[in-house]
Amino acid sequence: MSQNQETRGFQSEVKQLLQLMIHSLYSNKEIFLRELISNASDAADKLRFKALSNPALYEGDGDLRVRVSFDADKGTITISDNGIGMTREQVIDHLGTIAKSGTKEFLTALGQDQAKNSQLIGQFGVGFYSAFIVADKVTVKTRAAGEEADKAVLWESAGEGEYSVADIEKKSRGTDVILHLCEDEKEFLNEWRLREIIGKYSDHIGLPVEMLTKEYDDEGKECGEKWEKINKSDALWTRSKNDVSDEEYKAFYKHLSHDFADPVTWAHNKVEGNQAYTSLLYVPAKAPWDLFNREHKHGLKLYVQRVFIMDDAEQFMPNYLRFMRGLIDSNDLPLNVSREILQDNKITAALRKALTKRSLQMLEKLAKDDAEKYLQFWKEFGLVLKEGPTEDFANKETVAKLLRFASTHNDGSEQAVSLEDYILRMKEGQKAIYYITADSYVAAKNSPHLELFNKKGIEVLLLSDRIDEWMLSYLTEFDGKQLQSITKADLDLGDLADKESETQKQQDEAFGSFIERVKNLLGERVKTVRLTHNLTDTPAVVSTDNDQMTTQMAKLFAAAGQPVPEVKYTFELNPEHHLVKKVADIADETEFADWVELLLEQAMLAERGSLENPAAFIKRINKLLG
């Protein structure tokens, strides 16, 4: 008999997610069983952990398991566990709302592409709500460990706008999830179909999955029923990697991550000695929707002596490897370990160092063995990996080898060139790795600063991600070669520089008074004015000194709301260009000023992508064209 019944409305995000799931995951509908068994496994893990300090929570029943049964006449499937269970408050919190930061942004990001929706929802972790893919009504009966039998809770919903919650009596600890299947989903009311799904997705979770099966006598007559364990229920990571197939590794990854796609690669290692631990690390194929959400925890599952301790233990991986999935099982950490203890712990620091090294080795091997697959990985996670040089000095060179860039060597914008590739193609006498940063690939590719390099056939890396400038402030050299921006006023080409010709000397002398006129006109608005022989098709450019903040870094600071120091540019004019020659011959000071301002504005526009006063620029063009 239920008491204290109330009807409540779903959080708006839940309603939206339910509708998206029902329409987007139809082709993957069997995952409902994987998700519900995974939830049951989590409930068992949480009970084991809490019972370490309070064994009475087992209530005399320490054999944890999940049971799957069906009733063909009633059209129901029941998934039962004897794990931690839930209180009334927890039921409302967990089943009526989605307590995930960034949920609204995630739902907004979903478009009409069903394949994309399916993938994104899988990454989000649909969990309990996947039940509504196959059921038109879901009933949950649950009692939290340690609570009295009359403190159990009944939750019911048809997956629409609301749900009901009431108090009931339940003798056994744990949770029963009863699915009332839709009329066209009766295929799941079949023992062998359910066995197939459990074998596919849940064979290697560390919890026995049992099904109620019929027993037959010697004459083949049905004589009863019994609970039969139908999965291996061993902790896959405890087995020798030689005994685990690729398909088993892939299935375990999907259980662990709730991902639909296979991982790109994985590494399973057992380490003995001063520190004994086992790690199973995976590189996903697709970036999760919340990869750049700083509020969301990203990390490994932590086990101590095969006992689950916590999800998302971020202390074992640097932030730039937050896309890694997997687990670590340590023999050296205490069973009562907490996030606070992990924060300042020598064992944690040593494990983090080892797991970071192992992860980078996985990526190095992938890049070496399958360049195409690595480039697919790079498209998904390259932006995150670029954070590496800014936060991991010890592994900076290793991370640098894994970076990929667009380059003038290739036609397209694909980031496919490594620093090692670049060095192999360097010109004889070239001492630096040259690069340019810009707002976009197109802006970088068409920068006037490239003209001399294109003329000489010197490769330049084209960088257009927002993080690039920040990364390069830490990554200043690679393999003994300096990384040098080609937009700097004091650019040194070393042995590749042209010897100053007699013609250039004559030009410097002939344009001397012109340069002084420009300096006097612009005054403090620029750092200095000078001639340049590094341009071919462009009349003028602006550049910064080595000790000055670059344009892109200034933009980065401004976007982050940080104070930006004033950037004073060097204004460089091309004496070979017909416009510069024309301006140099203008005697009228007003006309001369208009043309100089126009050349400066053009140069600033090419460098910064915008002007402080675009209206004045347009007015000046119209005036000079008229």
Swiss-Prot record:
Any one GO molecular function term: ATP binding
Alphabetical list of InterPro entries matching this protein: HATPase_C_sf, Heat_shock_protein_90_CS, HSP90_C, Hsp90_fam, Hsp90_N, Ribosomal_Su5_D2-typ_SF
Region entry C, spans: 556-626
Region (B): 340-555
GO cellular component: cytoplasm
Keywords: ATP-binding, Chaperone, Cytoplasm, Nucleotide-binding, Stress response
Pfam families: HATPase_c_3 (PF13589), HSP90 (PF00183)
Protein family (similarity comment): Belongs to the heat shock protein 90 family.
Job description of the protein: Molecular chaperone. Has ATPase activity.
Protein name: Chaperone protein HtpG
The organism of origin for this protein: Haemophilus influenzae (strain PittEE)
